C-alpha cells in the first residue's frame, strides 16, 4: 500500500519496538502494584500523588500500545504477530485486574481523606474521576464476589462469542444465480453491491437470496440474544440496580425516564417518515422508469457522478465543506492529511468499515481508518470521521483528564460535519442541479431516519424484550419478530392490522429475521437510542454553523473542548440545547420537513425538465 495513503502508526511506539513497549508497560505495572500495596497509597498525600502520576504514565503508554495493536489488527486481521501480541496483552490485563480487585473498596474506605487531598489545586483535575466512582458506592460488590467475578471473567460473554461465529463464519451466504451466471458471495456487503446493480432482475434475485441469510440460524440467534440479555440483567441486579436499562441510565447520569421521553419525541416523526417513503418510491419509480418501486429497487444509487473521485479531490472538498468551523479547525484537518492520520484504501483482510480511534490521552495523532471507494460517498465518510478526530484534538488540547467523549454525545461532532456537507450541497445545487440536490438530500434524510426512526425501533425492541425477561419469560424467534414488527406501528405510522397480518407470513418474518443479528445488542450498554441524540443535536448545530452563527461556533468549540468533564446532558447544554425539553426535537423535525420540501421541489423540476 502506498505510504502516502496509509497511516503512520509507528509514531505510537515512540521509536521503540513493540516488545520493548510491552516490557515497559509490564515494568510500570509492577511499580503500580507495589505502590498500591492494598490501599497503602491512600495513606499520605505524597503517596497518593505519586500513585496518580504513575497511573497517568501507564495510561498514556497503554493508550499508545493498545491503539497500535488494535489498529494494526484492523489493518490486517490475520497478522499473527499482532494477534499473538493482542492475546498476551489481554492476559496481562486480566491478571493485572486481580491485584486491584479491592481498589474501589479502598476508594470508599478512604473517601474522606482523598477528598481532602483533592482540595489541592494540583490534584483538582482528578475530582470527576473519583466522584464517578463514589456515586457507585451503594452499587459496589463485596470483595469476595468481585474476586470471583474477575477470575471467571474469561467465561463471560459466551453468548457474544456464539453470536460472532453465527453472524460471520456460519452465515448462510448463498450465491446468487441469475441468467445462468453464479455470483459468489463472500460477505453480506456483496449482496448490497448486487442490490445497487443496474439490472433489475439481478437485484430481485439478490434480494430473495439475501432474505435467507439469517433464516436457518434464526432460532439459535434468538437463544443467543435472549441469553445475552439474561446475563446483562443478572449483572445489573448483582450491582444492586433494578435492571439493565436502569444501570445504563445510572452510568450515563440521566434519569431512566429520559429514554422514554426520547422514544416519544422520535415517534412524533412517524408521519414524516411515512410521507418521505412515499416520495422516495415516486422518485425511484420515475428515475428508473418502473411501474412500481420494489424493495430491491431502493438501493440503486441515483444520479451517480461519472468518473472516479480521488483522495486529493476529497481532501480539497473536505476543507471547503468544513470552512464554517474556522481556521483553527481547518489547520487540524490539514495536519491530519499531512501527518498521515488516515488509512485510506481498502486492502485484503482489512476492517471493512470506518472509525476514528478512542483512548487518546497522551496521543498527538488521532487516527482514522476508512475504505475509500473512489465515489463521493467516501467524502461523507471522511468528514464524519474527521469530526471525531478533531473532537479528540480539541479535548486533548484543553483537558488533562476525561478526554474521550462518551457514546451519549460522541456522534454530534461527526453528524455536524455531515450536515455541513449537506448544506454545502444545497447552496451549490438548489435551483441549479435538481438531480444532485435530490441525491444529496435523499442521502441526508435517509441518514436522519436511520439514526432516529430505525435506531429507536431497535431500542424499543430491546426494551420490550427485556420487559418480558424481567417477567421471567424467554422470548423465542416468533415472539422477537412480533415485538420488532410492531415497532413499525409507532415509529413508521404503519397500519396495525396490516402489520398483524404480515407477521403471519413467512416471507415477512424472513425480512425481519436480521433483528436477531444486530451486534450493538451485545455491547453491554443500552445505547442505540443515543444515535438519535447525535443526529438531532448535529442537525441543529450544523444548520447554525452553516449560516455563519458566531455564537454557535464559540459554543461548539467549548463543547468540543470539554471532553467528558461534565455529565452528558450538561455537556450538550454547552451548545445551548436542552434535550429534556421537546423544543430541540421539534426544531430538528421542522428542518427535516424543510429538506423533504426541497426534494419535492427538485423532483418537480426534474419531471418538468424531462417533458
Swiss-Prot record:
| Annotated active site | 385
Instruction: Quote the record's cofactor note.
Output: Binds 1 zinc ion.
Name the enzyme group at the top EC level: hydrolase
Q: Mind listing the UniProt keywords for this protein, alphabetically?
A: Hydrolase, Metal-binding, Metalloprotease, Protease, Zinc
Q: Which cofactor does it need?
A: Zn(2+)
Instruction: Report the GO molecular function annotations.
Output: metal ion binding; metalloendopeptidase activity
Q: Where does Zn(2+) bind?
A: 384, 388, 391
> Quick check: keyword Transport in the entry?
no
| Any Gene Ontology biological process | proteolysis
Write down the EC number: 3.4.24.-
Q: What Pfam families does this protein's entry cite?
A: Peptidase_M3, Peptidase_M3_N
- Enumerate the InterPro entries for this protein: OligopepF_N_dom (IPR013647), OligoPept_F_C (IPR042088), Pept_M3A_M3B_dom (IPR001567), Peptidase_M3B (IPR004438)
The entry sums up its family as follows: Belongs to the peptidase M3B family.
NCBIfam families registered for this protein in UniProt: pepF
Please identify the protein, giving its name as recorded. Oligoendopeptidase F homolog
State the organism of origin: Mycoplasma pneumoniae (strain ATCC 29342 / M129 / Subtype 1) (Mycoplasmoides pneumoniae)
What lineage is on file? Answer: Bacteria, Bacillati, Mycoplasmatota, Mycoplasmoidales, Mycoplasmoidaceae
Amino acid at each position: 500500500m502506498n505510504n502516502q495513503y496509509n497511516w503512520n502508526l509507528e509514531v505510537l511506539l515512540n521509536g521503540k519496538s513493540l516488545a520493548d513497549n510491552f516490557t515497559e508497560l509490564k515494568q510500570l505495572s509492577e511499580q503500580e502494584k507495589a505502590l498500591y500495596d492494598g490501599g497503602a497509597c491512600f495513606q499520605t498525600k505524597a503517596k497518593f500523588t505519586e500513585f496518580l502520576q504513575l497511573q497517568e504514565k501507564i495510561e498514556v503508554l497503554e493508550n499508545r500500545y493498545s491503539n497500535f495493536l488494535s489498529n494494526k489488527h484492523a489493518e490486517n486481521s490475520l497478522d499473527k504477530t499482532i494477534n499473538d501480541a493482542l492475546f498476551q496483552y489481554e492476559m496481562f490485563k486480566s491478571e493485572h485486574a486481580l491485584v486491584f480487585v479491592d481498589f474501589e473498596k479502598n476508594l470508599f474506605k478512604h473517601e474522606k481523606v482523598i477528598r481532602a487531598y483533592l482540595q489541592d489545586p494540583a490534584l483538582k483535575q482528578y475530582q470527576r474521576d473519583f466522584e464517578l466512582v463514589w456515586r457507585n458506592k451503594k452499587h459496589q460488590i463485596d470483595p469476595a464476589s468481585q474476586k470471583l467475578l474477575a477470575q471467571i471473567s474469561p467465561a463471560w460473554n459466551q453468548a457474544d462469542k456464539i453470536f460472532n461465529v453465527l453472524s460471520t463464519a456460519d452465515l448462510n451466504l448463498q450465491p446468487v444465480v441469475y441468467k445462468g451466471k453464479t455470483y459468489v458471495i463472500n460477505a453480506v456487503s456483496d449482496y448490497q453491491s448486487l442490490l445497487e446493480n443496474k439490472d433489475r432482475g439481478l437485484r430481485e434475485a439478490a434480494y430473495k437470496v439475501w432474505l435467507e441469510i439469517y433464516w436457518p440460524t434464526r432460532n439459535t440467534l434468538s437463544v443467543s440474544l435472549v441469553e445475552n440479555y439474561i446475563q446483562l440483567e443478572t449483572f445489573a441486579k448483582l450491582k444492586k440496580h433494578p435492571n439493565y436499562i436502569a444501570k445504563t441510565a445510572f452510568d450515563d447520569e440521566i434519569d431512566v425516564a429520559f429514554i422514554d421521553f426520547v422514544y416519544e419525541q422520535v415517534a412524533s416523526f412517524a408521519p414524516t417518515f411515512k410521507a418521505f417513503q412515499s416520495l422516495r418510491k415516486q422518485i425511484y419509480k420515475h428515475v428508473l422508469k418502473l411501474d412500481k418501486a420494489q424493495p430491491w429497487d431502493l438501493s440503486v444509487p441515483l444520479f451517480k457522478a461519472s468518473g472516479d473521485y480521488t483522495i486529493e479531490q476529497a481532501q480539497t472538498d473536505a476543507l471547503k465543506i468544513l470552512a464554517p468551523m474556522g481556521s483553527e479547525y481547518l489547520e487540524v484537518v490539514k495536519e491530519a492529511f499531512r501527518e498521515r492520520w488516515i488509512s485510506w484504501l481498502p486492502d485484503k483482510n482489512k476492517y471493512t468499515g470506518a472509525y476514528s480511534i478512542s483512548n487518546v490521552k497522551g496521543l498527538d495523532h488521532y487516527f482514522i481508518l476508512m475504505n475509500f471507494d473512489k465515489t463521493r460517498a467516501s467524502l461523507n465518510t471522511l468528514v464524519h470521521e474527521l469530526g471525531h478526530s478533531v473532537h479528540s484534538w480539541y479535548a486533548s488540547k484543553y483537558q488533562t483528564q476525561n478526554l474521550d467523549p462518551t457514546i451519549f454525545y460522541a456522534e454530534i461532532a461527526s453528524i455536524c460535519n455531515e450536515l455541513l456537507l449537506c448544506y454545502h450541497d444545497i447552496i451549490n445545487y438548489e435551483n441549479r442541479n435538481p438531480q444532485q440536490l435530490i441525491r444529496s438530500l435523499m442521502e441526508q434524510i435517509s441518514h436522519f431516519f436511520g439514526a432516529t426512526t430505525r435506531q429507536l425501533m431497535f431500542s424499543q425492541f430491546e426494551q420490550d424484550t427485556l420487559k418480558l425477561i424481567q417477567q421471567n419469560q424467554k422470548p423465542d424467534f416468533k415472539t422477537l419478530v412480533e415485538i420488532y414488527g410492531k415497532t413499525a406501528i409507532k415509529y413508521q405510522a404503519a397500519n396495525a392490522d396490516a402489520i398483524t397480518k404480515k407477521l403471519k407470513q413467512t416471507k415477512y418474518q424472513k425480512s425481519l429475521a436480521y433483528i436477531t443479528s444486530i451486534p450493538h445488542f451485545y455491547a453491554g450498554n443500552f445505547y442505540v437510542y443515543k444515535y438519535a441524540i447525535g443526529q438531532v443535536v448535529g442537525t441543529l448545530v450544523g444548520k447554525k454553523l452553516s449560516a455563519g452563527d458566531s455564537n454557535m461556533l464559540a459554543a461548539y468549540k467549548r463543547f468540543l473542548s470539554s471532553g467528558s468533564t461534565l455529565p452528558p446532558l450538561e455537556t450538550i447544554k454547552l451548545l445551548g440545547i436542552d434535550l429534556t425539553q421537546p423544543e430541540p426535537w421539534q426544531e430538528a423535525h421542522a428542518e427535516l420537513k424543510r429538506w423533504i420540501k426541497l426534494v419535492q421541489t427538485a423532483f418537480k423540476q426534474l419531471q418538468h425538465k424531462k417533458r
